């Protein structure tokens, strides 16, 4: 009987170890200020159009090794709500910037690669890759999206944040352990609004 209990304990410990993601390195945290923007306010530009694009390098971020079989999760957190009724690039959701009429999308860190950028969607999904070495892409793209026909040019923004994590929610319960990369704030400064669709 003791031997059976011992074997069961070993099996349980072994399955837990297999389900637990492993990490090396540290989380990277950045903030960005989008300044001297030229934003067109031409009402003929359709809602859902890209008004501005900015690509930033993430630098090295935390390495991981997880397992799809063990249902390890990829978590994207975006601090602001979805703009209701508006879709942007790739038919994806657009998130509030705090400026009425302008939303944003951000690229998916683990699904994007050179020549193929994927717009991110907040939420939990199965890990798209099992280890960093399968796609260690080190750029994030931010798109500003038109969400209303009339943009409130007096708005200043709410400094939204975005984070990317991977892990097993049972065996890697600490959010800090799972966190790979955080864009801690997207700020806006000196926006130049122009009633034209040129010089975006």
Predicted feature locations:
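N-terminal signal peptide c-region/cleavage motif recognized by signal peptidases
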Residues: 13-16
